Amino acid sequence: MRRNNYLLLLGLLLASCVAPDTQHHIVVSTREQKLAVLDRGTLMATYPVSTSKFGLGDYLRSSRTPLGQLEVAKKIGDNAPLGAVFKDRVRTGEIVAPNSPGRDPIVTRILWLRGREAQNANAFGRYIYIHGTPEERLIGMPASYGCIRMRSTDIVQLYNIVGVGAAVTIVEAPLISAIPGLASGHSMSPANTAPFVMR
């Protein structure tokens, strides 16, 4: 029993020593309903998403998507199958197929976000996630209750790329305005770490 407690304590200690992901940056455009992921300023991929149908903001119980600078605080769902249902961040054992009628649970993976500014300070306590949804037919239009929804296959890819601590920027502007260098077709170099434009 003591050995198990020791191993558990050692595991928790090592997990807390993992360096935050400073290599990746997620940028979400609520205007375009798109998400871009960058690796040291180089665009890796873009995905269609769905943000809140109630608009933007971070008021408690508002069901709105917060704007500004956030970070990935926790990752939940390692190795879960596509469509695996989560309730209170715990797998239920149920699998839901895309576009199942009458179903709208959180599925596949969860990236739990923490706000880094006053304008999004409630995000973590409001359980704002980037997560999979079975309502894939609604991806590309505002349909969520505050979270950022993705197709299950897309959230698995994103989940495998980013780590805890990865920066997340949510803007109203188009991605081309929010990411320096994207308009010219050039990625932002590691030396050019200009902040993302927030409009």
Question: Where on the chain are the PLM-derived regions?
Answer:
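Well-ordered beta-strand positions in beta-sheet-rich domains
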Residues: H25, T46-P48, Q69, Y127, ...
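C-terminal motif of bacterial Sec signal peptides marking the signal peptidase cleavage site
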Residues: L14-S16
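Bacterial signal peptide processing site
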Residues: V18-P20
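Electropositive
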Residues: M44, P48-A80
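Exported/periplasmic cell-wall-interacting domains
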Residues: Y59-R64, A80-R199
